[in-house]
């Protein structure tokens, strides 16, 4: 079965607010019924917040839209990334003030908070899952 793909074109047919990318993201969020799925849940939003000079990240205005949808649905969102990306996330616009929730390293500040799972696959004997990701509901 093919996956459903959601797409919002950057093209604006008219100079109206509803034609902007943030407004199109709001329509996708509505179609995904995010608000209906998160009540009372701790919701991790995993993303790449950039590293040093990185600029190919999702703009904070879009992240805030997703965060706000989770909050509107009664969820408790937070953003995670790897330690070396989240350390300077505020300098790239990813802060509690701009996106509406905290940004944490997924496996803790020292990258030592994880759960190991024994699930052999080919030459891999175990998998390590970042603690904050596994702990989210």
Q: Predicted regions span which residues?
A:
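N-terminal and secondary-structure boundary signal
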Residues: 1-137
């Amino acid at each position: 079965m093919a996956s459903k793909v959601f797409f919002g074109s950057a093209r604006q047919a008219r100079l109206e607010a509803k034609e902007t990318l943030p407004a199109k993201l709001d329509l996708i969020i509505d179609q995904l019924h995010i608000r209906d799925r998160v009540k009372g849940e701790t919701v991790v939003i995993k993303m790449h917040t950039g590293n040093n000079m990185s600029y190919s990240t999702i703009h904070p205005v879009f992240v805030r839209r997703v965060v706000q949808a989770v909050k509107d649905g009664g969820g408790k969102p937070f953003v995670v990334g790897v330690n070396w990306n989240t350390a300077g996330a505020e300098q790239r616009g990813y802060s509690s003030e701009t996106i509406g929730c905290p940004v944490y390293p997924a496996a803790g500040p020292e990258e030592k908070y994880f759960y190991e799972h024994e699930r052999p696959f080919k030459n891999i004997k175990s998998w390590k899952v970042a603690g904050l990701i596994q702990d989210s509901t």
